[in-house]
Regions:
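Terminal or standalone catalytic/regulatory effector modules within metabolic enzymes
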Residues: 1-188
Length: 188
């Protein structure tokens, strides 16, 4: 895969070799990442390089992590209470919404004082025969969620894996937020 390779090539490798079925909007986001990587290395990327960049971009971000959380559904109103590790700090977040994701986004949005909206969301089961080295050792990662967020007018994609679809979804939100933080520090 080189900097001229299309979105399809990268998405095909992730699907065939690792079981990730990237939605179109994630393909577009990731192909941009791969193109930058190929250009900075000035070399073609192998499928191992592709999964490594994929995992480092979306799955292994270490700036934000979900700690404990509780979701309550009371008469259709969903509340999220939990804590998120941000760098060295643990912050408590509380929010309400019409589902776990919107409650979490509202909680994070209020805590960070940022406008955050969900644009796209997709999820699927990770099939066992196509597991990346990252998920092989962690057979719990059998759900993957893809999320596209509008954060203060900028668009970011995030991906999360977990045994629980809800946790995968929340991790995807943190993955997108981490992309925003990285972009923020690069632009300032």
């Amino acid at each position: 895969i080189n900097s001229q390779s299309g979105k399809g090539g990268v998405a095909y490798i992730l699907q065939r070799d690792f079981g990730f079925h990237l939605p179109r909007w994630t393909q577009i986001d990731f192909s941009r990442v791969i193109q930058q990587e190929a250009e900075s290395r000035q070399t073609e990327l192998t499928s191992d390089d592709v999964i490594s960049v994929f995992e480092n971009t979306y799955l292994n971000q270490s700036t934000l992590a979900l700690q404990d959380y509780e979701i309550k559904n009371t008469a259709g109103a969903v509340s999220f209470t939990g804590s998120v590790r941000m760098g060295d700090d643990i912050i408590d977040v509380v929010g309400n919404g019409n589902g776990p994701l919107s409650a979490f986004i509202n909680a994070i949005s209020a805590k960070l004082n940022k406008n955050i909206h969900v644009i796209n969301y997709a999820e699927h089961a990770l099939t066992v025969e196509n597991q990346s080295p990252l998920t092989q050792n962690n057979s719990d990662a059998n759900a993957v969620a893809y999320l596209q967020l509008n954060i203060e007018g900028e668009i970011y994609s995030g991906i999360g894996t977990c045994s629980s679809t809800v946790s995968a979804m929340l991790k995807a939100a943190l993955s997108a937020l981490a992309q925003a933080q990285i972009a923020d520090t690069e632009h300032h």
